Amino acid sequence: MFDRRLLQYFDWGLLALASIIGGIGLFTLYSAVTAETPEPQKIIFYKQLIWFSAALFAMTVSFSINYKLLDRWGQVLYIGCILLLVWVLFFGKYVGGSRRWLILGPVSVQPSELAKIAVMIVLARYYSKDANTRGHTLRELFRPAVLTLIPFFLIVRQPDLGTAGLLLLIAGSITLFVKIERRSLIYLMVSGAAVVPLVWFFLKEYQKRRILVFLDPDLDPLGAGYHIIQSKIAIGSGMISGKGFLQGTQNALSFLPEEHTDFIFSVLAEEWGFIGSVVLVLLFLLLIFWGLKIAQGCREPFGTILAVGITSMIFWQVIINIGMTMGLMPVVGVPLPLVSYGGSSVLTTAIGIGLLMNVSMRRFMLE
């Protein structure tokens, strides 16, 4: 139940930051699906408005309940998420060569998005109860590794390498934060470096092509490299101040693929230029800094680790998505938080921000 005393500690700054980024996202999405596009395409924008309304409700719930209840129910949430990931492999909606979505009446959801929150909670639960100032050994890291790898492999099977890789980055960020024994860290780094080249042999052909065209888009300029080339043209053509709202030609002439999801940053960069791009990046950096300050000010380990996990989720999504659009990273289908179209992504981010607010408010409460 919501404690009314917490209202005096409500984090209005965090809410304002998230609202501004979300507002920029809606304006950019409107442009992406409106400029010289057929009327049916505009329904994407109206769907996103509905998802934002649902996200507002989800955020309200997530900051209203005591986040410490997640410590108690974390395992149940995790198991439920694993069951959903198994279910989607057999009964999920098959789109574009992957099976990632569960159909729930008129809407579809991605359990892999919810898996990010579930893994954060169980890792925060484990590390908060197994504090180790000298650093965790390989033996102590075995259980959190298993908790991470189970959903990881289920997501890889869909296949969705972008979300699976993001899950590893979030888990890795949390684990580095709680500290790893030096010898164990060196062993993990060497082992990881040895395993990475072997991953190539397990990739599907289209995944290999994405990596190759990331290294040289001109290898397939009309195929796998087309996305990156057109995205870089859009970003570069925006120059300093951009072409103006609804004036982006790459988007309007349908040169830019996936303009409302993976490459929405390219739409923003073309219309608002370098200045608009920097403003959005600075807003994200401020949001990340805000999350880390909340983690630093928390008085107990579970809340601290949870805040670090949520902040790392936002950080890595921003890095990967913007990196994709600029040709600095392979195209792996990771959305830009609160900007890209996608109900599951918006809900997950809203829940995460709500939990950050939760930790922020309750850190001031006297024990």
Label for each model-derived stretch:
Residues 213, 217-261, 272-276:
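TM-adjacent membrane-interface loops and short helices in multi-pass inner/ER membrane proteins
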Residues 160-165, 243-248, 259-261, 278, ...:
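Transmembrane helix boundary and interhelical junction motifs in multipass membrane proteins
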Residues 1-18:
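N-terminal membrane topogenic signal
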